[in-house]
């Protein structure tokens, strides 16, 4: 039997905690036998003293085991269970293409996603712009969809990593969110509860990233790869660029539209294509569906070219109670904004800098995201036809097309776009889409 205060004291004094001590504390968070004050105290000691790799693995596994861990053995699936997690960005719609693409190549993707957080869009919010789309199927239905379609994207239920919810709520109000061991455990507890064989992490770098510097993004990616592999799940990470909006659009319905256009080949933003393909390649190799980069890319290109990936997306939408002809008739189903109008720069020039975070917040301000959990979302608003770094803009080429609910909202968004995008006399050096791959 342990005492919570003795565990806190031990960590306060700079000592490593045992697996048993960590499990006792996390189970106490779940069972409400550990107080909020004790959670806050332990979080702060971890913030200042860090954790060893064995402690990080124990914390992650204890949080994972605080609830249900999905088990797929009874379905006798003929491929690996794989997933991707992104630290979040603006116009980061990769999940909607990646899931169907990997499923079409033989993987199974039980993707448990989140809502928008701060300036970053949420996959669930995007999918809910599709009429009827059900993000909370019951467990049996979820398993059926995975078996029949190969991919389902759903919301987190209270049975998955419940200790994380309480732990995070306390961290949020005690200035202990930005601790790498705690971020790592929070992300991985939920992902590892999916019962995965392999995982790829997309850790964003730049103005629209969760971590403020390249070095911190890199440290987080390395921590996640180390802990996840330590927990028995083959994991790699890519550091990808978020110094500009990733897709050509930012919002909810507008990003779903772009995802369908990507899958059908109607339009593919080159940077979005690079990041999506790179993540899919990792999933195919880690999931042993391809032996190397070249084989993985060939398989992925084939399922885009032959329409199989688009077909899987359509089947997923239908299986989750969306329209059965969504891929063919997406324009009929997705909500459209009352006012759609381009915004132009005040002077000519080349796009040299973009504050992706500010553009994400502009979408929130238009009603496309939440300031607090109870807010309702206007799925129709956002930006399309975004200028990219290096683009020349003038009276013909706009900075973006704004989809707004009224003229006032459009004016505010136009101001935000102009403030977020800097111009120069010449095009800047191009930046890579993928900075680094991290593996064990």
From Swiss-Prot:
The keyword Glycosyltransferase applies. Pathway: Pyrimidine metabolism; dTMP biosynthesis via salvage pathway; dTMP from thymine: step 1/2. Keywords: Glycosyltransferase, Transferase. Its EC number is 2.4.2.4. GO terms for molecular function: 1,4-alpha-oligoglucan phosphorylase activity; thymidine phosphorylase activity. GO terms for biological process: pyrimidine nucleobase metabolic process; thymidine metabolic process. It catalyses: thymidine + phosphate = 2-deoxy-alpha-D-ribose 1-phosphate + thymine. It is an enzyme of class 2 (transferase). The keyword Cell membrane does not apply. It holds the Pfam family Glycos_trans_3N. GO terms for cellular component: cytosol. InterPro entries: Glycosyl_Trfase_fam3 (IPR000312), Glycosyl_Trfase_fam3_N_dom (IPR017459), Glycosyl_Trfase_fam3_N_dom_sf (IPR036320), Nuc_phospho_transferase (IPR035902), PYNP-like_C_sf (IPR036566), PYNP_C (IPR013102), Pyrmidine_PPas_bac/euk (IPR018090), Pyrmidine_PPase_CS (IPR017872). The enzymes which catalyze the reversible phosphorolysis of pyrimidine nucleosides are involved in the degradation of these compounds and in their utilization as carbon and energy sources, or in the rescue of pyrimidine bases for nucleotide synthesis. Homodimer. Belongs to the thymidine/pyrimidine-nucleoside phosphorylase family. This is Thymidine phosphorylase.
